[in-house]
Amino acid sequence: KSPRPGDVVVFKGTEDWNTAYRSPRSENPVIHGIQDALSFVSLAPPDENNLVKRVVATGGQVVSCQAGDPAVMVDGKPINQDYVMNPPTYPVDPSTGSQSCGGAYFGPITVPEGNIWVMGDNRTASADSRYHMQDEYQGTIPVANVRGKVMFVFYPFNRIGGVDDPDIQAS
């Protein structure tokens, strides 16, 4: 099933998202080989940069947030942002962005077919699609990189419970 707006997904970051990624694999070639073998049979995590973000827009949709917008906009309509962390972690510079944008102004970006635009719920502290707009995918993530949908949070313990996935584009 393809990710929908509002879904919280786990995905493998594209090259631009991986500049700070450091492999957890051992530098010892024997241990590294064992880790790879265990990963192949799902007994160890894969050696990739898996990230968690909320889907905001899907292929063919236009996403943006400009001065005066009441929220992040998809196809010219504001999305529901009730799930966004408030108060924000960091202040927003009003000369370059807004609270409703969760940081700097951006877009418009047309999401390529087969890709998704993702944003963190902690908008002012999230290096999400907005911070990768100069890469070959314009900050979007190929749906093929999605590993699954987040259903439950175990940690931190003060957030343990199910994950809401509201239709953030509902009018």
Regions inferred by a protein language model and the residue ranges of each:
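Soluble "head" domains of membrane/secretory-pathway proteins
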Residues: K1-S171
